Amino acid sequence: ALFEESLFNRLSDRLEQRFKEIRHRYAERLRHGRALTDAPDDVMVFLKLVAMRFRHLTMTEYRLNDSWELQFNQLRSLRPKRLSGEAVAHLSVAFDPAKFHFNKPFLDKEILWKGEMYDLPVSLLYNKFPFVPLHGLLVPEPLKNHPQMLNARMHTMFWKLTQDAGRNIPGIGFAYNGFGAGASINHLHLQMFVRQTSLPVMHPRWMHNGGQEEYPAACLVFEDPDEAWLYISSLHHANTTYNLVYLPG
């Protein structure tokens, strides 16, 4: 709710009441020497919120600087680092059921939708620490425990999904973070979002979009899924991490 002011204004009283209820429950358990039974990550984030106080939480702030979009996101600063805080030596790491993943029972309440896409089971979760509007997490074949390593089959599915969804949902996009490029969870997933404005990387000033200025990072645009996969595969062979943005068009 802190990411969307109109939503927060409608829910703030109920959110504060719920905040007080959980704070009281935690305090009572701790006073009587009883363990807190919620997920450790959730407990740690909530204790940080208690230290900050509900009334001191701030809405996400934006500032445009030339073609760049700057964001101060207080809530996201509380996000557990998980794998994003670890040194990365290899692009692919085996799935570890002992670490955080999207099949944890306490995440069931965060699943917005379960169903099938292109004959594959898919789960859509909301992101508790959003940095884009309508920020979701799309997890294909969640029970197969795929690590966060893209393969040709999933890439083709993601490409098709983007094109199909784009016909009905203006501004939709999907993003993939590899290990060493922002991925914090070793369970195959995409970031899903819906924006009213284009991402800064799409600005026509950049050379990869036909402009005259060089983007600060290496950036390529592909209009064919097979050509894109050939390049992605070459990055895999070179053990080079990367980010992807799937956009309709």
Model-derived regions: residue spans:
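Active-site microenvironments that recognize anionic phosphate/pyrophosphate groups
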Residues: 1-154, 172, 195-223, 228-249
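Short connector loops at helix/strand junctions that flank enzyme active sites
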Residues: 119, 169, 185-187
